UniProtKB/Swiss-Prot annotation:
PANTHER family: UPF0045 PROTEIN ECM15 (PTHR33777:SF1)
Protein name: UPF0045 protein MTH_1187
Complexes and interactors: Homotetramer.
Coiled coil: none
Superkingdom assignment: Archaea
InterPro entries listed in its UniProt record: MTH1187/YkoF-like, Thiamine_BP, UPF0045_domain
Organism: Methanothermobacter thermautotrophicus (strain ATCC 29096 / DSM 1053 / JCM 10044 / NBRC 100330 / Delta H) (Methanobacterium thermoautotrophicum)
Cysteines joined through disulfide linkages: none
Lineage, uppermost ranks: Archaea, Methanobacteriati, Methanobacteriota, Methanomada group, Methanobacteria
């Protein structure tokens, strides 16, 4: 299981509101076989393998461009753990057990 944090930022928009661009990216993710969680600062992803993750990243990136942005800045953090099959909720629960 691969977990990741994705942030896609449209640049040069005429507004400080970015929710319509985020919505376009999420609509693109809905069409794929990845689990996602939206947060106030980015989107968390779970994928079975790197190819599946990168397909989702590309889809979200392209969706923001298609939504009208002429320039997009995308950041991606990947946790590719292969010794155990742990998802996003497992990570949160592990911390909660310790506090």
């Amino acid at each position: 299981m691969i977990t990741a944090e994705l942030t896609v930022i449209p640049l040069g928009t005429c507004s400080t509101s970015l929710s319509s661009y985020v919505a376009a990216a999420v609509e693109a993710l809905k069409k794929l076989n990845v689990r996602y969680e939206i947060s106030g600062m980015g989107t968390l992803l779970e994928a079975e393998d790197l190819d599946e993750l990168m397909e989702a990243v590309k889809a979200a990136h392209e969706a923001v461009l298609q939504a009208g942005s002429d320039r997009v800045y995308t950041t991606l953090k990947i946790d590719d753990r292969r010794d155990a099959d742990r998802g996003l909720r497992d990570k949160v629960e592990s911390v909660k057990e310790k506090i």
